[in-house]
Amino acid sequence: MNKIMIVEDSEDIRGLLQNYLEKYGYQTVVAADFTAVLDVFLREKPDVVLLDINLPAYDGYYWCRQIRQHSTSPIIFISARSGEMDQVMAIENGGDDYIEKPFSYDIVLAKIKSQIRRAYGEYAAKQGEKVVEYAGVQLFVERFELRFQDEKSELSKKESKLLEVLLERGEKVTSRDRLMEKTWDTDIFIDDNTLNVYITRLRKKLRELNAPVSIEAVRGEGYQLRAQS
């Protein structure tokens, strides 16, 4: 069952969207605290986000940019703004589609289905998309998405870069310096503890997926992956 996150400050519209989508078999989650939209997204991991532009505290463009730092999940803007520039800004800030209010619920449903097909279904993993795999664990590089069997986990851009290097190397040891160079790609000094934090996060996400892979530290050398039997 696909999960749809609704970020809409009108209780009436929010309720109608929930009822309509649930009638067609979707699970819905609502962001009611408009200062914590990203927190809800990271906790609930929705497949599609319906996002209004005119919101209390921060607008929809802001939240779209915040989400894009962590995920490539489809984001559909739903707004009363009908100007061409509003639609341009929605796309430039990371949105995938735009629906004007007032809207047809059938159109909303059709666009959700289209985005799900594109991101996860028959149009997913298009030719040329990079997928790195080790011991059954798959990383969809462009999506920052980690998968094992039927479970998935969204990664941040840095987590994805780091795991990409480790998956490509497999059981070969990769030095800490090499991992930091590949992940941060910058001349700015990166504290060793920063790498430790990201390794800890990746270990946690692999455990949550019950993936048969662990990230092992090799004293004085770096890190390697180890397939578990």
Swiss-Prot record:
Main location: cytoplasm
Modification after translation, per record: Phosphorylated by YxdK.
InterPro entries xrefs: CheY-like_superfamily (IPR011006), OmpR/PhoB-type_DNA-bd (IPR001867), Sig_transdc_resp-reg_C-effctor (IPR016032), Sig_transdc_resp-reg_receiver (IPR001789), WalR-like (IPR039420), WH-like_DNA-bd_sf (IPR036388)
Modified residues (4-aspartylphosphate): D52
GO term, biological process aspect, one: regulation of DNA-templated transcription
Origin: domain of life: Bacteria
CDD domains tied to this protein: REC_OmpR_NsrR-like (cd18159), trans_reg_C (cd00383)
A GO CC annotation given for this chain: cytosol
Any one GO molecular-function label of the UniProt entry: transcription cis-regulatory region binding
DNA-binding region (UniProt annotation): 129-227
Keywords for this protein: Activator, Cytoplasm, DNA-binding, Phosphoprotein, Transcription, Transcription regulation, Two-component regulatory system
Subcellular location field: Cytoplasm
Domain Response regulatory: 3-116
SUPFAM superfamilies (alphabetical): C-terminal effector domain of the bipartite response regulators (SSF46894), CheY-like (SSF52172)
Transmembrane feature ranges: none
Pfam entry (one): Response_reg
Function noted in UniProt: Probable member of the two-component regulatory system YxdK/YxdJ. Positively regulates the expression of the yxdLMyxeA operon by direct interaction with its promoter region. Could also indirectly regulate the expression of the dlt operon.
Name of the protein this chain belongs to: Transcriptional regulatory protein YxdJ
The species this protein was found in: Bacillus subtilis (strain 168)
